[in-house]
């Protein structure tokens, strides 16, 4: 193994104007991992690079070289800085060769890897998070029909509207307290005041999404309740949101309100972020047989993609933007 020395990485960063100096930390005698760390940085926040060569398998005699970049980031879940919270994002590259590989073959692996990492293909894949390249790779070789190119995912914000869409349910304002909290009911009841219909600045097809980009991996559907990176929609579980547990945990802004009139019902309402109003959960439940879909968009400050499990949803990670009724398949 070469002597572990200081490594200077120049011409890095988006504009190629940054330099990173890495000082050797040493080699772990147990696993042979060589480690370097950013010079002059606070230990908890320094960048680190590790290089390791795995032990060869008994039969195949394969060696694997792994280069890993560790970028510690101090942040909280809501995106604010907090030096006491450290999260490490890893980027690693692994390539292998056998003990029978010649010097020329190993040198070719090194130079080929460097050229690949500098290619526009990888730069675009990383910068644009572009999922289209599997299609291009398939189309570039082999036989058979060529699949259509896949359009990349959209930004995490809602797409620009191509029209208008009005909420299919009555919408309400719940500001004035009708009854204060009690010992058995630790939340207030509000006066529900019906509002004039409000339009979303998107058309229905925008909310459901063009399948060529919104559903690019075919997992975003009513049945799988799976989000696609930052954007997605899910079948709303209005039954759960109407429970006392949902009122207590307040993962979403749910309020109890009394509808107008002497015989007005007391119901629970869910807040819709896009139109700044509330919608009755009983209305949503009544239409559920026909198919109710709630549109979600990830909040840019949440730092996380849409979860798999509905119970992990909350108003920060997945704010409810819109309620739309669509036929069930």
Swiss-Prot record:
Entry coiled-coil feature ranges: none
Compartmental location: Virion
CC per GO annotation: viral capsid
Effect seen on changing residue 34 to S: In strain: Qbeta_3_FR
Record key words, sorted: Capsid protein, Virion
Consequence of changing residue 211 to A: In strain: Qbeta_3_FR
Keyword Lyase: no
Top-level taxon of the source organism: Viruses
Protein name: Minor capsid protein A1
